[in-house]
Regions:
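Active-site core of glycosidic bond-cleaving carbohydrate-active enzymes
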Residues: 1-257
Length: 257
């Protein structure tokens, strides 16, 4: 329903993520301090919507790719995407509490993050196939990126992710939410050649197809002929890879600014 658009966690969590991105880039924690109480209220709201640690509303991996009309997440379960984002912002809040020396909140939200991680693994992990959710690229990339996969299973899940990309002819199936986690999971695991192969072509899904089509701005859909907006801040997550991985311009972990 419309509430998915009004309060999808993948967009709402920007309120928590952005102050940290600002801090990591500039070394300025003023936004974390200024908005801490609001960040906490938002997370406490998500907790009221969770059922045993699982958040089940929102748009999921919006506009993911396949032989269907783009829109609501089709390749990846909405609760998997929503719960992973819930986990991410709770982790951030625990870190914010540590920065503010709020020991009660550190303990509270660290414990909550562990409970969410356990619930996520219980709900979505398939031990027999070593995959999460449907085994889609987003299903496996999200928990890998967020460090939710148990150490013993990590390589197998990553191998399954790579196998799925290859099974799709070195093409992605992620949408506007999953792209970042897919791209960064590959980059952080030294799979930049695969990233290059996945994007260095002129077919949909791919940026080359948009260029060949004549687009001068990013389009909302991988194939602009399908309609939707032809000037949209969408699918631009490769920028982060250009800067961080290709050009080597990135922040040093643990050294903000």
């Amino acid at each position: 329903g419309m509430d998915a658009f009004a309060e999808s966690p993948e967009w709402g969590c920007t309120f928590v993520v952005l102050p940290f991105m600002y801090y990591e880039t500039y070394g300025d924690d003023s936004l974390i301090r200024k908005y801490y109480n609001g960040m906490r209220r938002y997370i406490d709201y998500l907790t009221t919507r969770a059922d045993n640690g699982i958040v089940s509303f929102g748009l999921g991996d919006w506009y993911d790719y396949g032989d269907f009309r783009a829109g609501f997440s089709r390749n990846t379960p909405v609760p998997l995407v929503a719960t992973a984002h819930y986990y991410m912002v709770v982790r951030y809040l625990a870190e914010a509490a540590r920065m503010l020396d709020n020991r009660y909140d550190v303990a509270c939200y660290t414990r909550l993050s562990e409970e969410i991680k356990e619930a996520f693994h219980r709900e979505f992990y398939h031990k027999d196939t070593r995959q999460y959710g449907t085994g889609s690229q987003c299903s496996n990339a999200l928990p890998l990126f967020l460090g939710m996969v148990p150490a013993d299973d990590r390589q197998a899940v990553l191998d399954n992710l790579v196998a799925d990309i290859k099974r799709h002819g070195n093409r992605l199936t992620t949408g506007d939410v999953g792209n970042r986690y897919l791209f960064q999971t590959l980059a952080r695991n030294g799979l930049n050649e695969l990233m290059y192969t996945m994007h260095n072509h002129e077919e949909a899904p791919g940026y080359g197809f948009q260029l060949k089509f004549g687009a001068t701005t990013l389009t909302e859909q991988w194939d602009p002929r399908q309609g939707s907006s032809w000037n949209h801040f969408m699918m631009g997550q490769i920028d982060e890879w250009f800067f961080n991985s290709l050009a080597g311009i990135r922040t040093v972990e643990g050294k903000p600014g």
